Amino acid sequence: MWLVRHGQSAGNVARDLASASGRHMIDIPTRDVDVPLSELGRRQADALGRWFSALPEDERPEVVLASPYVRARETAARICHEGGVVPGAKGPVIDERLREREFGILDRLTTEGIRQLHPDQAEHRALLGKFYHRPPGGESWADVILRLRTALDTISLHHADRRVLIVCHQVVVLCFRYILEEMDEEAVLRVDKEGDVLNCGVCEYEFEPDDERECVPRLVRYNLAAPLIEDEQAKVTAEPDVITGTR
């Protein structure tokens, strides 16, 4: 199973501009769900598709699942278009449980904007920590994990013994790691603190039977940038999503 964060989006670019200029709001003219890939993000997705296509056919994805957010759907579609899956592969199948973490009243605010416009939320987050803090109308990491557990149950039920590619978002990748590697809060936040998940970076798991013949996930690689480094049309980016806050 592969977990891939979407390519660079127009929202990633807008967030950087807003933060650099000290603005409180991120200038995005659409809903977060409708934010597309940037031109670089499209090249990143194409490069990743070509990287998958270079694998032997019996090592390529057989099923592609994607978040309903446009940037994830575009990434998944471009990977498939570049031949990154087996012929006749299923998908991209859209699953709303793979969507971005919902930020509620903090949506489109920069870190400085949160401090200035919602100081109570900044204080509450500092007290609870980013794992459990749930902004009004939004989700905590723990909330995201709850829906991802059900998504994994569905994958096990309908796609057992198939190679599955999941195209999603930064926090979703980290929350999948939390579940699959049986992490605790401290462990997953330590991974997060090491740096952002790369746009189109590859996280790969193999599932191997244990002594009780249950399939146990083993992390093969995390945040692999090689597909982008090897392609002249793309470059590596690791920009935070629209709202992340301090680590």
Model-assigned labels for residue ranges:
Residues 1, 101-115, 178-247:
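Acidic, low-complexity terminal tails and accessory targeting/binding regions
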Residues 1-7, 166:
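Short, hydrophobic/glycine-enriched beta-strand segments
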Residues 2, 11, 16, 43-123, ...:
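Phosphate-coordination/substrate-recognition cap region in phosphate-metabolizing enzymes
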Residues 6, 41, 169:
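Short, conserved phosphate/pyrophosphate- and ester-handling motifs at nucleotide-, phospho-/glycolipid
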Residues 18-45:
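Short catalytic helix/loop segments, enriched in acidic residues and glycine
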Residues 28-36, 122-142:
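Short glycine/proline- and acidic residue-enriched helix-loop micro-motifs
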Residues 55-59, 155-162:
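Glycine-rich phosphate-binding loop signature in dinucleotide/nucleotide-binding domains
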Residues 66-67, 146, 167-168:
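Short beta-strand scaffold positions
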